């Protein structure tokens, strides 16, 4: 595959990148995150977290480690690129380490935030190595579980980026293009989007659009959404909003593993341990910034203890991978004393949690996987979501895996997921 720098000021110095990114087709587009799959696992296993905290593996033709941070730039589009529609790629570079025979790009692309404003977001595009005609391959848009909310927590920036795309090797072997957004605020600096459904949805859908601008990989408008935990939340919102936000995409189905489908229940179930304090800190920090015009002045003080108010911005700077001990040091003393009020009943906060809970009927085939041993996303919560979708008339394929927990459910479900994808994609 080849790329071209079309002399866009945002793409760099004019040298030829390794894949050809072609100009976008103009679209009429309506303006319109969850929970860590790794939280429970990493909180219990800081040594493993340290082992996984490596930088990008570099090779000839790839950006060296020291250049990765500079790749992401600013979340605010440059004047030369502000008119570009969602999905337009403004920067790209190759990433080594993809499964054998595959090629990967790190990209920065246009998307939108909760207010419909134009922003830049980063992510990965991975494709089988064989070049094929345009429109040949289904695009699987992967929504990752929680890794943090700070820019340096982005999966594409080097926190084992391919290892965190669950099922990547098999999805590529099945002939799919796989894309993986970082979500707004990660990679490219900007406001966090953790568990903000509209922003997550746009980011997940727009990177599927972006794949169509990479020549030679055969990305079609057929899209399957796939997410785990926080990523399940993102994928469900993407499915809810696809018809209006990205009507040109042919979304064939949405698959989720242990999705964050009920935010109020999530906080009530988990706030009494380190995982819950961490999830709460990420969410409350993101909401306080994204919804500043709706929340009272000093919004964190309306639901958090004084110690919690101090801790949230500190925790927001830390990633689950590699900074786990520091998260523990901050969160442990606050277990049982983090909240001063219940966000599920507090004015405005309760409305925001409800708005960002995916309750609409899913109109495309829905695959749901849940582990019986999951203590982060409770099986009863997922069962209630499945029942509500079935009652609303959704087409649901549901699997409960007796031995799976939160960290293992996505990979446990992979064989069933691939079989289901063959029926929809």
Located regions from the model:
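Short beta-strand/loop motif that positions the catalytic acidic residue
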Residues: 362, 367-374
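Primarily recognizes the serine-hydrolase "nucleophile elbow" in alpha/beta-hydrolase
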Residues: 210-279
């Amino acid at each position: 595959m080849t790329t071209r720098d079309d002399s866009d000021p945002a793409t760099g110095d004019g040298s030829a990148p390794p894949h050809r990114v072609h100009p976008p087709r103009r679209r009429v587009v309506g303006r319109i995150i969850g929970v860590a799959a790794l939280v429970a696992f990493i909180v219990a296993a800081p040594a493993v977290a340290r082992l996984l905290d490596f930088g990008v593996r570099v090779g000839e033709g790839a950006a060296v480690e020291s250049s990765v941070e500079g790749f992401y730039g600013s979340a605010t589009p440059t004047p030369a690129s502000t008119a570009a529609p969602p999905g337009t790629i403004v920067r790209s570079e190759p990433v080594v380490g993809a499964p054998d025979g595959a090629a990967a790009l790190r990209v920065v692309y246009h998307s939108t935030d909760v207010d419909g404003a134009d922003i830049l977001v980063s992510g990965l595009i991975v494709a089988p190595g064989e070049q094929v005609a345009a429109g040949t391959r289904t695009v699987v848009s992967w929504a990752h579980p929680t890794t943090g909310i700070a820019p340096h927590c982005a999966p594409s920036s080097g926190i084992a980026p391919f290892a965190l795309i669950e099922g990547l090797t098999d999805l590529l072997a099945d002939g799919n293009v796989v894309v993986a957004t970082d979500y707004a605020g990660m990679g490219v600096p900007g406001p966090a989007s953790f568990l903000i459904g509209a922003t997550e949805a746009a980011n997940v859908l727009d990177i599927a659009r972006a794949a169509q601008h990479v020549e030679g990989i055969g990305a079609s408008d057929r899209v399957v959404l796939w997410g785990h935990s926080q990523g399940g939340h993102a994928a469900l919102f993407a499915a809810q909003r696809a018809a209006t936000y990205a009507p040109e995409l042919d979304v064939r189905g949405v698959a989720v593993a242990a999705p964050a489908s009920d935010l109020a229940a999530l906080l009530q179930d988990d706030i009494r341990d380190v995982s819950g304090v961490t999830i709460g800190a990420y969410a409350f920090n993101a909401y306080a910034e994204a919804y500043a015009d709706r929340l009272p002045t000093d919004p964190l003080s309306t639901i958090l203890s004084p110690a919690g108010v101090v801790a949230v911005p500190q925790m927001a700077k830390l990633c689950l991978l590699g900074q786990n001990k520091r998260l523990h040091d901050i969160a442990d003393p606050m277990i049982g004393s983090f909240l001063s009020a219940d966000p599920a009943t507090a004015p405005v906060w309760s409305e925001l949690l409800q708005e960002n809970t995916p309750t609409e009927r899913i109109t495309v085939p829905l695959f749901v996987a849940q582990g019986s041993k999951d203590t982060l996303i409770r099986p009863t919560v997922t069962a209630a979501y499945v029942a509500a979708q079935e009652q609303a008339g959704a087409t649901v394929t549901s699997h409960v895996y007796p031995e799976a927990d939160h960290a293992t459910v996505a990979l446990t479900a992979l064989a069933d997921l691939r079989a289901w994808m063959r029926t929809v994609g």
